[in-house]
Amino acid sequence: MTDETQEQQITAVGNEMSASFLAAKKRSNATLAKLEEHPEKFTMLTGDRPTGRLHLGHYFGSIRERVAMQNRGVNSNIIIADYQVITDRDTTEHIQDNVLNLVLDYMAAGIDPNKTMMFTHSAVPAENQLLLPFLSLVTEAELHRNPTVKSEMEASGHALTGLLLTYPVHQACDILFCKANVVPIGKDNLPHVEITRTIARRFNERYAKKNPVFPEPAAILSEAPEIPGLDGRKMSKSYGNSIMLGATAEETAKLIKKSPTDSERRITFDPIARPQVSALLTTAGLVTGRDPKDIAEEIGDSGAGALKKYVIESVNEFLAPHRERRAELAKDMDYIRDVLHDGNKRANEIANETLEQVREAMGMRY
């Protein structure tokens, strides 16, 4: 293959992705307008892998929007995707603790178990069984083209496993088992929703033309800003640059104090030239609702010490109510387990019904 041919292929893929994003953005805006008028007509599925504790990036990137959707009256579901932990990890150590801490943080942030079903992947076998018919609806080439699979494989440093390759199809099972028609996501996760739409469409066309079984879900594209870690890199638990929602005030202060800055005394907001200082300003701006540039102007020549002091005070003030609610909930872990057991029970009822509809459509009821 010549360099020119490779360049043409890269350009074609880029144009295809750009067109796909524009179509998804248009669909997202139209769906949001309908959702505002009739939230009861929408079912949302979202979730997290229990690979560690939730941090500020999770809150501003997704959890805040989940709470808002729930409170609007959208039928809300949150999956704790424990099976998906092993897509790029060789151990399930700490998974019990991680799962329970997710539920604690969800509820402390405002997720109401009476309005939102929280459940774990591994506890809903009928949902996972959908993977078999769904895999027949996609090609190997389509799976290999998924950019999220590529990036996850590169980040993990592992060989490509069958579970990682089929990760997007497993996510389609998560979304479609409860007939979710809206999925709040960031731009990076759009390919997962697109392949879910493809699977739903192909299943209905192949097996259920007269009575479609699955909706084609719309991605609700997040308007949340990308939140950098305290060192200016992407916020990640593995980098140790994240402010955990459940961290104490002292732990938070210690983390912020040791975050890197630069040699310039005057504080300015410049994410490209000064990523580390700008990351601290962005964090302060999010938790206070202020423009990071205004904060930088206010601190001025007072230097990095004054900036870190401001960030510590702002973050701790913002997280204080969350910590208080979390501590109160943590006094009764049996209740937290009951919430999860109840969610698992409800999810099984829904998944069993959906699987029966799938078997009926495929002529596999005996």
Give the location of each predicted region.
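Short helix-capping/linker segments at secondary-structure and domain boundaries
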Residues: 74-75, 140-144, 177-184, 285-295, ...
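Short, polar/flexible loop-turn hinges at active-site or ligand-entry regions and domain interfaces
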Residues: 91-92, 183-186, 267
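A generic secondary-structure signal for well-formed alpha-helical elements
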Residues: 103, 110, 138-142, 180, ...
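Short runs of predominantly hydrophobic/aromatic residues within well-ordered alpha helices
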Residues: 130-131, 163-173, 196, 273-280, ...
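Internal, conserved structured core segments that host functional sites
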Residues: 145-203, 207
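Conserved nucleotide- and phosphate/pyrophosphate-binding catalytic cores
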Residues: 191, 197-366
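N-terminal Rossmann-like or analogous alpha/beta NTP/dinucleotide-binding catalytic cores
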Residues: 2-173, 327
